[in-house]
């Protein structure tokens, strides 16, 4: 993986995430983008998900909440991708989650650790920033 590969992969992930957030795609497809195991860190503390069902559960709850708020799409407000080595990149981004009418559902800032293994690139850690 090089930096351009990581950026292209993240853009494809974001497109898929939008479809999942709207309910337009089978939520099991999230496993094409999130690694197992998965580390998620929020202001409430770190959480470690050791199997596919746990990953589907945590990401599924996030998607359900977005859908309940009328989520339609995400606008990436700022981002930076850094290649750490040939199998690992970090993507940091600030995002606006929007409804179909353009009103904002939420703003999110997060860092994604993307690792490349036998199944291709996956998000191995999702680090949600406070504030």
Task: Give a label for each model feature.
Residues 1-33:
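Short, low-complexity N-terminal intrinsically disordered segments enriched in polar/charged residues
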Residues 10-17, 34, 55, 59, ...:
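Hydrophobic alpha-helical core bundles mediating ligand binding, dimerization, or RNAP-core interactions
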Residues 27-81:
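A solvent-exposed, acidic/Ser-Thr-rich amphipathic alpha-helical stretch
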Residues 76-82, 94-97, 109-116:
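Hydrophobic/aromatic beta-strand elements that line small-molecule binding cavities or substrate pockets
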Residues 85-87:
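Residue-level recognition of beta-strand termini and adjacent short loop/turns
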Residues 97-105:
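Short, cysteine-centered beta-strand-loop-beta hairpins and adjacent loop/turn segments enriched
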Residues 105-131:
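Short beta-strand edge/turn micro-motifs at domain boundaries
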């Amino acid at each position: 993986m090089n930096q351009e590969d990581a950026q292209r992969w993240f853009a494809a992930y974001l497109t898929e995430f939008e479809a999942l957030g709207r309910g337009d795609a089978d939520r099991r497809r999230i496993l094409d983008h999130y690694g197992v195991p998965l580390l998620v860190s929020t202001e409430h503390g770190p959480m470690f998900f050791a199997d596919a069902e746990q990953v589907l559960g945590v990401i599924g709850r996030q998607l359900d909440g977005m859908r309940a708020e009328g989520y339609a799409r995400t606008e990436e407000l700022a981002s930076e991708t850094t290649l750490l080595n040939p199998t690992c990149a970090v993507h940091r981004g600030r995002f606006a989650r929007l409804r179909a009418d353009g009103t904002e559902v939420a703003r999110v800032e997060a860092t994604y650790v993307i690792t490349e293994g036998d199944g291709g690139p996956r998000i191995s850690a999702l680090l949600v920033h406070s504030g």
